[in-house]
């Protein structure tokens, strides 16, 4: 089973050897733009995607950035281009500087209710590896899975080692700016000041997001609300190390970034004992058996 996929990036040669990096699929897509092939000119029509699910819009964005260009094909299965839904997106060629496919996909994922989007390698046949775009639906933005794996931490034992917890206070207000210039620039505000107005208040924290590629005010409001929903709670982020030599630990390839897991904690100073639903954000390691797992930020259980 393939676990890591990349394209050969910058290569450096010496008289004795060569070295190169692997570029991820998002790095490749950051160098492709969502523009209709053969029709880039002043006044050219926009790419309009209407009445589709967000993951179908993402699939179409991927097609325009790959199959829709000469020598643009990449070994990616984009999925259903026609899945119906209540979403629309318009991409104007004059806004090309904001239309790298990677940026567009990130904005689709980060809008309020946006789906998780990931790329997973698989063996297309005995000799070829392809990628499959896996994305959540409009009804359930998370990537589907068959089994929820369990990890546990407690003093002296458990399948988790080196547990660390980073804490972050809430963001109560988000300013968003959209298309336009100077006084004509579109703006939107999302706020919830509940934490500022309680008896022992949190100090107000504000964020600003820019979405200059959209002149749709409702979409701009969705970006602002999406950021507020993500950051409003007092948050914590758990990072831990697991040893693949431990039979209690799931194997690489059994879990992927984006998967839900259960983390059982007992005796940690700043997290109450209990079982916590967590979502795997990142996995890292080397050729050894130790793997570092970083989970998505979650609502801080010590602040509830």
Give each language-model segment a name.
Residues 130-134, 253-256, 288-296, 304:
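Extended non-globular C-terminal regions
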Residues 137-283, 303-304:
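Acidic, small/polar-enriched beta strand-loop surface segments
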Residues 1-82:
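Surface-exposed cap/loop segments at beta↔alpha junctions
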Residues 1-23, 27, 262-297:
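Short beta-strand and beta-hairpin "edge-sheet" elements
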Residues 58-63, 105-110, 262:
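Generic solvent-exposed, charged/amphipathic alpha-helical segments
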Residues 1-7, 118, 173-175:
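Ordered hydrophobic segments in well-structured contexts
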Residues 35-42, 151-153, 294-298:
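Short intrinsically disordered coil segments
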Residues 10-29, 78-170:
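Short beta-strand-centered interaction patches in the first periplasmic/extracellular domains
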